[in-house]
């Protein structure tokens, strides 16, 4: 086995895939809410779909909808219909050569691709989740490194923290965590579900927010890591 491209922990050992998680391709971005953290830059202008395919708008109050990039979206489309949402997403990914493809949750994406998942509450809303690589979070001030590693499902040596018991707000970097992130409405990015638990697999996460329950799984896609780049509103 060639371990050259396998993620490693801070001590140089091979990083452990999060328990109950899904495999990484190695092309996932590091999670941080910095880009979307400001009222002016990210929260108001970007939605879960834009984040999923790495399209970032620094201006405008209009959020990107599936089918807009490919100009296949019509006024009569119901994007909470799984079939329609899937078709419009595929059309958008096809606007670029090797932009992305339909995938399986349990099979890692090809090199240079990362994984996203879509769910709907029929007649109400759709929602997207995106798998990340390393994850940078802020401590809640309640857990030490051992308990946090156990809670996430990774080895302790995959965590980098200022102390063994970081104070509230202190940064913690988790190597190759493979957690899933998402963005709801005007909120910040998060790797937590509706119950405040780390998202290891969106299919197992709590996806109920008030009267909206994203209970219907639509599909999994692998998106080219460069799909959203090269535009004025790309993440990087």
What are these model-derived regions, one by one?
Residues 29, 37-50, 104, 110-119, ...:
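Ubiquitin-like/PB1-type beta-grasp interaction modules and other compact soluble beta-rich domains
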């Amino acid at each position: 086995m060639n371990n050259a491209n396998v993620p490693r922990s801070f001590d140089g050992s091979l990083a452990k895939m999060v328990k109950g998680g899904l495999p990484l391709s190695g092309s996932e971005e590091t999670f941080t809410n910095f880009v979307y953290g400001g009222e002016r830059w990210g929260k108001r202008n970007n939605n879960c779909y834009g984040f999923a395919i790495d399209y970032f708008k620094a201006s405008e109050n209009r959020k990107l909808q599936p089918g807009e990039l490919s100009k296949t979206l019509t006024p009569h489309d119901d994007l909470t219909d799984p079939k329609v949402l899937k078709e419009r997403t595929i059309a958008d990914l096809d606007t670029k050569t090797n932009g992305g493809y339909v995938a399986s949750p349990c099979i890692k994406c090809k090199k240079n691709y990362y994984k996203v998942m879509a769910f709907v509450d029929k007649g109400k809303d759709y929602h997207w989740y995106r798998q990340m690589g390393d994850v940078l979070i802020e401590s809640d001030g309640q857990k030490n490194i051992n308990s946090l590693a156990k809670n996430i499902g990774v080895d302790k040596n995959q965590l980098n923290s200022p102390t063994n018991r970081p104070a509230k707000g202190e940064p913690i970097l988790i190597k190759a965590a493979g957690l899933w992130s998402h963005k709801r409405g005007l909120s910040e990015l998060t790797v937590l579900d509706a119950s405040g638990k780390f998202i290891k697999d969106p299919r197992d996460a709590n996806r109920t927010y008030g009267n909206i329950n994203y209970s219907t799984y639509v599909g999994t896609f692998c998106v080219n890591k460069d799909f959203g780049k090269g535009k004025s509103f790309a993440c990087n």
